Each structure stands twice: as C-alpha cells, then as structure tokens.
Regions:
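A composition-driven surface/loop motif
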Residues: 1-277
Length: 277
C-alpha cells in the first residue's frame, strides 16, 4: 500500500450535486470530485488517461438502468473515498445495453488500478453480474462494504489487497475472487471482518493467498449441510451402487491455486466442499 491509499483528506474538491444531473457524469481530468445526492438513472464515467482521480462519495446514491453505476474506463489510478459517517449506494439492473465484449460487467467496474478507503459505508446491489470488478489491482483500506451480487461479489484480475475494514458479501457466484492465473492473481488480507455467503467459493485466489489476521465467517454452496457425496450405496445381495453427487462448480470455503498462508485469525467456515483448499 502507498501513502495515497490511506489518505482520506478531502482538499480542493469539485462538488457535484447528483440531484441536478441527468444522464452520465463524465470525469476527464485529474482532481478530486465530491459527489452527493441521487442520480436516478446514469453512470459516473472516468475517462482520464494517465490521471489520478479521487471520487468522494458523500451520501451519494447512483442508479443505472443500462450500465455500471460507476465505470472507470481509463485512468492511471482512481481512489474512491467514503467519508466518516456517510452511507452511499450503487445499484444496477438485470440487463445492460452495452455489448458484453465492450464491458462493463459490474456495478463498480474499473479497467485500471482502484482503491477504496474511508470509514463510511458503500452498499452495492448488483443485479446484472458482479458487485465490484477490477481488471488491474484493487486495494480496500479500512472501509465498509456491503455487496449483494448476481454473480461474484468482488472480482479482481491482477491483485487484491485488503487492510482492515468490514465486508459483507452475498453472491450467487464467488464471494471474493482473483482471476489472473498466468501471473500475479494474489490475494492478501491484513485484518478486517468478513461475512461471506457465496453459492460458489467464498474466498478464491488464482495465485497466492495470504491472511495475516482477521475474522472470517464464510458459507459456500449453501453450507456443509449440502455435502458432497461421492460414496457407494449398499444394494440387495451385497452389491454396491456407485453414485456421484459431487458438485459441478467449486464450492469451497477458502481456496488458493498456489500457496495458502494463514498466520492468525478467527475462521468459521461452512462449505459444501473443502473448508480450506
């Protein structure tokens, strides 16, 4: 983490009232933009090549009926700050009008580095696919996120770094996942409180997974009551009937494709498959 990832000071911000906006709010230059109010149907789009942009969500509520409520198309880095005592929200719908190949595919979608910090709260309801998706590096720094997603809760390609904070994720896919299998794809957590309920993997890393400390409550695939059954049943005349009810999708509690290191922490895991894999 860098110094600016911890910085939550709001200086020289350009204030934007979303109540006065219609359609998309476009950010094309470096700077700090403080958003408040409600955008009933539109997106905040960052298209600022090689610029560092800070977006302050000050009780901001963004709804989009046809795309991502927040879309970072290009930037050197975007920092989203949630000021103390504020509660903001992002909400999309079940369909986007954009071509899927052109993206986006999450309520908060970034093609470049993204940091979310500040002790405020961000509530995300993703009815299309993912809650948060970052195609570069995502850093979550001592913040509060509540995510409900039709697919993955938090999906990151290159690296995900989490330092402190509170994270509640309910996902029909993976809870928190990194995807870059060829290089990077690491997931690192240093403290924080996590409540994850996922139909697939709770926490999944395509690379190394390192947890220094934290409190984790993870339910995957409906929990251990929906167990994987790969045994054989005794039939009349002493014969066994082989049957396989193994899940087709991965439904593990905490999973790493490479190395997994857990230094400290409290773990309560109810998983359809392996608790740790």
């Amino acid at each position: 983490l860098e110094a600016e990832d911890y910085d939550t000071e709001i200086n020289d911000a350009q204030k934007i009232s979303l109540d006065e906006q219609s359609g998309d709010v476009k950010i094309k230059k470096a700077g700090t933009y403080q958003l408040s109010g409600t955008l009933k149907n539109g997106s905040v789009v960052v298209d600022a090549k090689a610029a560092v942009v800070r977006i302050v969500l000050d009780n901001a509520h963004i709804r989009s009926k046809n795309s991502a409520p927040v879309y970072v198309k290009q930037a050197d880095k975007v920092i989203i700050t949630l000021p103390k005592g504020t509660a903001s929200s992002l909400k999309d719908t079940a369909s986007y009008t954009v071509d899927e190949k052109e993206e986006p595919s999450a309520a908060l979608f970034s093609k470049d580095d993204l940091t979310i910090n500040g002790s405020g709260t961000l509530n995300i309801t993703a009815s299309y696919k993912n809650g948060i998706q970052c195609k570069d590096t995502l850093k979550l720094v001592d913040t509060n996120l509540n995510i409900t997603a039709e697919n993955d809760g938090i999906k990151v390609r290159d690296a995900l770094l989490i330092y402190k904070g509170s994270y509640t994720v309910k996902a029909q896919g993976d809870g928190i996942v990194t995807t870059n299998e060829k290089e990077q794809g690491n997931l690192c957590i240093d403290q924080g409180t996590f409540a994850i309920e996922a139909q697939q993997d709770g926490l999944q890393s395509a690379g190394d997974l390192t947890i220094y400390d934290g409190v984790f409550t993870v339910t995957s695939g409906g929990g251990s009551v929906h167990r994987v059954d790969t045994g054989s049943a005794l039939q009349p005349w002493g014969e066994f009937d082989d049957h396989d009810e193994a899940v087709q999708k991965s439904q593990k509690g905490i999973k790493a494709a490479k190395n997994m290191v857990l230094y400290k922490g409290s773990y309560t895991i109810s998983s359809h498959d392996d608790a740790l894999h």
